[in-house]
């Protein structure tokens, strides 16, 4: 399993405490604190301030929930990635028995297989509601492909102690069961990318018009990765460039939430480009 920021324990104890003014008056806000001490020494650190009605679910509860859901699913799920920066948490699974293969110009492209992924997102500072969603993973390089539009997600409104929690579980399982058409649509766009030769004019078009919100520094990393991986190839494709994007954004050794946001941005924009310009 790929871990990001391993020095932070995503499953440390957490608590929600009322805030008070300097004169002792109560505040309507609450502080979220995590125990950063070794072996539960009670060294509490504030990681966020939220409202009284904020549903605080610990990352341990999220892990238990994810484990319950993946056990209920008929697919064989494996934890592939874990992200935690002290405030935001992500747990990413892959089902290697639920795959599709890129359809190249000469038929099915051997060895380029994409698997269904399932992720759970949580935050301690209120920046992200507890959510479960689907993504894809290219198995040959373990690049994750996140999307805001291509695949569904479920906002989880209850914790395991709530009787309505099972409703959320059923919604997530239904999301998995009904994903085939959505995945097929994404694979169709990926196949068009794979059939499309990337020349300098198209690369400029992508940089300027398709993914203009990617910063110059990030685009530079993507271009270096693309140049390295396509060295010696007669005809690099749009698919090669897109995978350079996801490689940089998924495997950043100093990963931030912005990498996941940019991953979804690039994926959605490139799929839209493929559907409108390449077909």
Residue map of PLM features:
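Intrinsically disordered, low-complexity coil segments
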Residues: 36-44, 73, 100-112
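Intrinsically disordered, low-complexity regions enriched in serine/threonine
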Residues: 1-22, 98-279
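Feature for intrinsically disordered/low-complexity regulatory segments and propeptides
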Residues: 1-67, 249
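Short secondary-structure junctions
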Residues: 16, 69-83
């Amino acid at each position: 399993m790929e871990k990001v920021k391993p020095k932070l324990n995503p499953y440390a104890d957490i608590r929600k405490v009322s805030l008070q003014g300097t004169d002792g008056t109560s505040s309507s806000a609450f502080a979220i604190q995590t125990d950063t001490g070794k072996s539960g020494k009670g060294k509490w650190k504030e990681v966020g301030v939220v409202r009284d009605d904020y549903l605080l679910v610990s990352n341990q509860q999220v892990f238990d929930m994810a484990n319950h859901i993946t056990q209920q699913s008929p697919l064989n799920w494996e934890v592939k990635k874990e992200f935690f920066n002290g405030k935001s948490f992500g747990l990413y699974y892959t089902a290697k028995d639920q795959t599709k293969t890129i359809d190249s110009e000469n038929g099915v492209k051997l060895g380029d297989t994409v698997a269904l992924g399932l992720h759970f997102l949580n935050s301690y500072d209120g920046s992200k509601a507890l959510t479960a969603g689907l993504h894809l993973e290219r198995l040959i390089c373990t690049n994750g492909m996140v999307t805001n539009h291509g695949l569904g997600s479920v906002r989880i409104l209850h914790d395991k102690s709530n009787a309505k929690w099972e409703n959320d579980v059923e919604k997530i399982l239904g999301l998995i069961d009904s994903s085939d058409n959505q995945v097929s649509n994404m694979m169709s766009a990926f196949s068009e990318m794979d059939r499309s030769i990337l020349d300098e004019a198209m690369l400029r078009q992508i940089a300027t018009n398709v993914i203009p919100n990617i910063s110059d520094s990030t685009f530079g990393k993507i271009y270096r990765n693309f140049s390295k991986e396509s060295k010696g190839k007669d005809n690099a494709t749009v698919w090669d460039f897109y995978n350079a994007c996801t490689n940089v954004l998924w495997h950043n050794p100093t990963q931030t939430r912005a990498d996941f946001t940019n991953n979804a941005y690039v994926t959605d924009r490139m799929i839209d480009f493929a559907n409108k310009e390449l077909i």
